[in-house]
């Protein structure tokens, strides 16, 4: 090692110390997380919840599209039917230890039952505690779409109404009446 190389090494070290010392007077970029709350961006995809209709019924019709759309297969559900013919999930289970929070289940849901919230604090000590059942996922409100009711929009008979009598729905067309 020559004297020239030693001088260059010392100069580089002193320059690095100078640059680091100048950063001591700048504003910190790091936030002290538990003390300072973190505000995620508006389209942040966090914890998954199941919402209800404005009437208070479950929105989920157990169509299984969310489970099919999930790339890591963390959603499982079983369909059941009420006496009036309405479908609902008998059980709905999400394994959050496998979930990658991609949001494909929310996009696939035709009833807007699945919605992603900005909650991100889901740490647990046991992996079994990250498996959420329907009772854990179901919230009391309608979520992002307060006025939407799938059965009213889809035209399924509600409380004795026939097809065509629901909100924003036309009467069924008689195809035989169109023939010459």
Swiss-Prot record:
Family annotation (PROSITE patterns): 4FE4S_FER_1, 4FE4S_FER_2
Entry keyword annotation includes Thylakoid: no
Protein name (record): NADH-quinone oxidoreductase subunit I
Residues where [4Fe-4S] cluster 2 binds: 70, 99, 102, 105
Gene3D superfamilies: 3.30.70.3270
Phylogenetic placement of the source organism: Bacteria, Pseudomonadati, Pseudomonadota, Gammaproteobacteria, Enterobacterales
Catalytic activity: a quinone + NADH + 5 H(+)(in) = a quinol + NAD(+) + 4 H(+)(out)
Family of the protein in this entry: Belongs to the complex I 23 kDa subunit family.
Enzyme Commission number(s) of this protein: 7.1.1.-
Cofactor: binding comment: Binds 2 [4Fe-4S] clusters per subunit.
GO cellular component, one term: plasma membrane
Main location: membrane
Subcellular location: Cell inner membrane
Coiled coil start-end: none
GO BP of this protein: aerobic respiration
4Fe-4S ferredoxin-type domain ranges (all copies): 48-80, 90-119
InterPro entries recorded: 4Fe4S_Fe-S-bd, 4Fe4S_Fe_S_CS, NADH_quinone_OxRdtase_chainI
């Amino acid at each position: 090692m020559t004297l020239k190389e030693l001088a260059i090494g010392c100069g580089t070290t002193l320059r690095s110390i100078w640059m680091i010392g100048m950063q001591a007077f700048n504003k910190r970029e790091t936030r002290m997380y538990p003390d300072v709350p973190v505000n995620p961006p508006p389209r942040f995809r966090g914890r998954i919840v199941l919402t209800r209709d404005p009437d208070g019924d479950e929105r989920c019709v157990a169509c299984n599209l969310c489970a099919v759309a999930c790339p890591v297969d963390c959603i499982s559900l079983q369909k059941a039917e009420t006496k009036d013919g309405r479908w609902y999930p008998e059980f709905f289970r999400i394994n959050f230890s496998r979930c990658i929070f991609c949001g494909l289940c929310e996009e696939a849901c035709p009833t807007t039952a699945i919605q992603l919230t900005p909650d991100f604090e889901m740490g647990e000590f046991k992996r079994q505690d990250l498996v959420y059942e329907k009772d854990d996922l179901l919230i009391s409100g309608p979520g992002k779409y307060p006025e939407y009711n799938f059965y009213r929009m889809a035209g399924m008979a509600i409380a004795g109404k026939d097809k065509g009598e629901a909100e924003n729905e036309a009467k069924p067309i008689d195809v035989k009446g169109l023939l010459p």
